Amino acid sequence: MDKLVIQGGVPLHGEISVSGAKNAALPILCAGLLTDGPLTLDNVPQLQDIATMRKLLLHMGVKIAELGAHCLRLDASDVHTCEAPYDMVKTMRASILVLGPLLARFGHARVSLPGGCAIGSRPVDLHIKGLQAMGAEIHIDHGYIEAKAAKLKGARVFMDIVTVTGTENLMMAATLADGLTILENAAKEPEVVDLAECLVKMGAKIEGAGTDVITVTGVASLHAASHDVVCDRIEAGTYMVATAMTGGEVRLSNARADLLDAVIDKLRESGAEVECSDNSIIVRSKGVVEHPGTLKSVSIRTAPHPAFPTDMQAQFMALNTVADTVATVTETIFENRFMHVQEMQRLGANIEVEGNTAIVRGREFLEGATVMATDLRASASLVLAALVARGETVIERIYHLDRGYERLEEKLRQLGARIQRIK
């Protein structure tokens, strides 16, 4: 199993390009099931989760042509099965996103209950309730969601918890439903907006994406389209925090600052300089490698977009471990999302957990050790901690990283980090 070996203590300098967003690409790949016309997608990241979704779509009969390293053309004109088997979805929670499109276009679906990171229950009942409100008959049998509907009907759906994948699934299903669907308490994440923009290019009638009320007027069919996947705000944020911690100056191209307001505010609060332009972000920082004690502690509280993103919580915890005073990190989205704490403590971090809040007391330095990645963002936070730790850090089980970061070690090496993957 691959490991990362990192020699800490090097400020970062240079420029890297931010990849397309995994969390936008996955639902957009599923949107290809809604039409028999080709869907051409550019800026698709090369990640394990994307490869898993491609395998699932191929299993269903979708033809996928590679037009370039990050460009795919999907053709779902000859789908021959509407089943997503357990073996293909057990590692990826986003597989539930085929449910809405299959049901809307083909009238039936059999989808295994999904897997993914072990960070909380992440229930799919909101997806099911929403589809039932639109007229679907659904039951769960031997770990599979069995759904059928002769024709989905527009409905008013209130989601009592903000759910990104739930919003996406119901929005896709509603594009081919009869009449008007109103999704209330909808997720406002940029990835939801990107999916809506792609669907509109395919002929869907959607208004309100990016607000908490999305209206979808169903159409008879969708058609061929082309779409560029939005940049990955979490990848960008991760490299921004890395630069703030190590010190140096890094320019991120293909990055949108307007998607990162909460993260940028907190980075500036920590003492980093952040300069934003149309398609790039520059981060400058003294950092703790050459200037210990210059990083200011920042307290954060996660909440749905546009508030502070849960997917940046672990990275800011890493920052706070080497900051000047005490910070609190409060997680309100997922339970079990402090699994990185124990591993950070192996590097010398001073962290106490009380319920859904971690109290982080900054210290002058961390020390290298062997640690284990537990989920996608936790593994990223361990990389950040290792970049400023004294000596060598070995991070095991980095397959979690490969699910969500494209060529992370190559990009960090490009910025001067001493990092290598070993088999």
From Swiss-Prot:
One of its GO terms (biological process) is regulation of cell shape. Phosphoenolpyruvate binds at K22, N23. It is found in: Cytoplasm. It comes from the Bacteria. GO terms for molecular function: UDP-N-acetylglucosamine 1-carboxyvinyltransferase activity. InterPro entries: Enolpyruvate_Tfrase_dom, Enolpyruvate_Tfrase_sf, MurA_subfamily, RNA3'P_cycl/enolpyr_Trfase_a/b, UDP_GlcNAc_COvinyl_MurA. Its EC number is 2.5.1.7. The keyword Cell cycle applies. The active site is at C117 (proton donor). The keyword rRNA-binding does not apply. Keywords: Cell cycle, Cell division, Cell shape, Cell wall biogenesis/degradation, Cytoplasm, Peptidoglycan synthesis, Pyruvate, Transferase. The modification 2-(S-cysteinyl)pyruvic acid O-phosphothioketal is found at C117. GO terms for cellular component: cytoplasm. UDP-N-acetyl-alpha-D-glucosamine binds at R93, R122, P123, V124, D125, L126, D311, I333. It catalyses: phosphoenolpyruvate + UDP-N-acetyl-alpha-D-glucosamine = UDP-N-acetyl-3-O-(1-carboxyvinyl)-alpha-D-glucosamine + phosphate. Pathway: Cell wall biogenesis; peptidoglycan biosynthesis. Cell wall formation. Adds enolpyruvyl to UDP-N-acetylglucosamine. Belongs to the EPSP synthase family. MurA subfamily. This is UDP-N-acetylglucosamine 1-carboxyvinyltransferase. It comes from Methylobacillus flagellatus (strain ATCC 51484 / DSM 6875 / VKM B-1610 / KT).
